[in-house]
């Protein structure tokens, strides 16, 4: 009888043993989002300047990832649509000037697709790649002559431009009220999801523009022409954004259900003096709902987004917008979706307004607040470049204190109906320097899926220990792993060890655990002692 078949037959014994191991079957604490935004607009993070060769761009991106990986980060959110343009090879959107120096100008190497390279580079390091789009920003200035001829801001006839675009301040924006614009943006997202192996689509905080003194939105005629059922223009504006968010969500789920859709909004939804029921105890001058017309809570309630990553760019105790109060508020309004907190890495050691940011303890306080809230699944830092500069030794703080152990991205169980197939350890081989483990997958049953990657937990002694101890996670395999072999080179002669393997799917939901394997490290190798059948993780 092979190991997989025997595992299936003996699964019912797990019910009997489940109480014994109940504490070990809880959600692993090694699950935590640890991400960084990589901004391309204005060449904030990457590439360092326009016009670099493809090899130079690759080298710079690899360098960023290597530093982030050393800090045990597990995801990057890369801005691939900074201002109506593309940091990738698109049949719809012109090449970005931040890449080549001129909008519409392709890289010198015709085979080079920056996003394709970045995805592979991230996945090779076992980091998720989320494609970050600014949906509505059409230009970063008023110089339309410098735009690519294929840019609709140039190519459309003047009588249609007024439907597609509006000017606000010194920039042009896509008009959220236009059904044609909405379909255009959906097509952009659809193209990315179909052609690229991304883990998520990410929108930032820009919907309607941040308000400027003396500026008014010029959309009253559009509202008069097509108010739909609205009598209030502000409700109408919010609904314009709602329609895009809903349509993008549905488009993604139809194409690739595992691709996550999330947003990184401004950190305050509404102040309490604006909304006693849904407002936070803050005095923010700008808020999502009333100024940017982004009804984040509606998107969460309706399940249109899979996570929210509010930009809480203030310190713990900052009077107008206290970090701790805002984390608590967002934690009470997740509606079953994931919550990742956006941290202002750019303020670390660099604030003339709030002295808290000039203390190396501030980021420790913020992460402590996050981890004390059961509804917070992790953090995203804005942005990568400040982390690389290491202000106040933040890299060292992350590596040696806060992010000392590796983690997986928390599983989004609401995005899948089944767990991935359960792996089983099928071979143990020892040498003087290592214990080698091999595992395989049981017979595939209807509706089950192969793991996307694997984790190995190791416990000292001859029993399964605490899965909540992050030091027990000793190995995470590459994505799309087919090798199914691991060498543990940190064993000690004469010591007994217990190994367990689990698998994860594309939304990081973990499988049942394998049966534990008990091994004694000997002078010349390792000796497998016995198995406990039917243990469920």
Regions found by a protein language model. Name each.
Residues 393-449, 493, 508-537:
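Pro/Thr/Ser/Gly-rich low-complexity, intrinsically disordered linker/stalk tracts
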Residues 180-188, 194-203, 207-281, 286-308, ...:
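Active-site neighborhood of glycoside hydrolase catalytic domains
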Residues 31, 39, 43-59, 131, ...:
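Active-site-adjacent "subsite" loops/lids of carbohydrate-active enzymes
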Residues 59-85, 196, 298:
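Catalytic domains of carbohydrate-active enzymes, especially glycoside hydrolases
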Residues 293-319, 335-414:
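Substrate-binding cleft of secreted/luminal carbohydrate-active enzymes
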Residues 488-510:
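Beta-strand-rich modules
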Residues 71-109:
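Aromatic-lined carbohydrate-binding/catalytic grooves of carbohydrate-active enzymes
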């Amino acid at each position: 009888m092979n190991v997989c078949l025997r595992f299936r037959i003996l699964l019912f014994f797990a019910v009997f043993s489940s109480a014994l191991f109940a504490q070990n079957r809880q959600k692993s604490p090694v699950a935590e989002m640890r991400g960084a935004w990589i901004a391309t607009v204005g060449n904030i993070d990457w590439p360092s300047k326009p016009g670099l060769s493809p090899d130079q761009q690759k080298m710079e991106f690899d360098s960023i990832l290597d530093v982030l990986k050393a800090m045990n980060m597990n995801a990057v959110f890369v801005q691939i649509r900074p201002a109506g343009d593309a940091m990738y090879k698109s049949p719809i959107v012109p090449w970005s000037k931040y890449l080549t120096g001129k909008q519409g100008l392709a890289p010198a190497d015709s085979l080079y697709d920056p996003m394709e390279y970045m995805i592979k580079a991230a996945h090779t390091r076992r980091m998720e790649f989320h494609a970050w789009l600014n949906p509505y920003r059409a230009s970063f200035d008023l110089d339309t002559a410098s735009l690519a001829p294929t840019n609709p801001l140039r190519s459309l006839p003047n009588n249609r431009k007024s439907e597609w675009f509006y000017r606000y301040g010194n920039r042009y924006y896509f008009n959220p009220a236009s059904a044609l614009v909405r379909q255009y943006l959906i097509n952009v997202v659809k193209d990315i999801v179909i052609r690229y192996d991304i883990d998520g689509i990410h929108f930032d905080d820009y919907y309607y523009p941040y308000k400027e003194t003396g500026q008014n939105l010029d959309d009253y005629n559009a509202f008069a022409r097509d108010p739909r059922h609205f009598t209030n223009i502000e409700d109408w504006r919010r609904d314009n954004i709602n329609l895009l968010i809903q349509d993008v969500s549905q488009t993604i789920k139809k194409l690739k259900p595992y691709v996550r859709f999330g947003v990184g909004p401004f950190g305050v939804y509404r102040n309490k003096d604006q909304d006693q029921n849904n407002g936070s105890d803050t005095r923010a001058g700008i808020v999502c709902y009333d100024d940017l017309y982004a009804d984040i809570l509606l998107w969460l309630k309706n399940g249109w987004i899979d996570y929210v990553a509010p930009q809480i760019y203030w310190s713990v105790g900052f009077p107008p917008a206290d970090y701790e109060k805002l984390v608590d508020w967002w934690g009470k309004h997740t509606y079953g979706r994931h919550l990742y907190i956006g941290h202002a890495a750019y303020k670390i050691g660099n604030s003339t307004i709030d002295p808290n940011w000039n203390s190396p303890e501030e980021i420790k306080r913020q992460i402590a607040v996050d981890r004390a809230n059961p509804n917070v699944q992790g953090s995203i830092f804005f942005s990568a470049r400040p982390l690389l500069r290491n202000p106040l030794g933040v890299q060292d703080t992350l590596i040696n204190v806060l992010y000392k152990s590796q983690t997986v991205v928390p599983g989004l169980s609401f995005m899948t109906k089944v767990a991935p197939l359960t792996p089983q350890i099928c071979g143990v081989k020892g040498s003087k320097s290592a214990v080698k483990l091999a595992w395989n997958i049981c017979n595939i049953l209807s509706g089950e899926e192969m793991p996307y990657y694997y984790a190995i937990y190791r416990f000292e002694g001859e029993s399964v220990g605490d899965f909540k101890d992050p030091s027990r996670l000793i190995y995470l395999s590459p994505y799309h792993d087919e090798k199914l072999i691991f060498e543990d080179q940190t064993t000690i002669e004469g010591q007994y060890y217990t190994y367990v393997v689990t698998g994860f799917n594309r939304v990081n939901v973990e499988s049942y655990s394998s049966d534990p394997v008990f091994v004694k490290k000997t002078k010349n190798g390792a000796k497998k002692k016995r198995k406990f059948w039917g243990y469920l993780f």
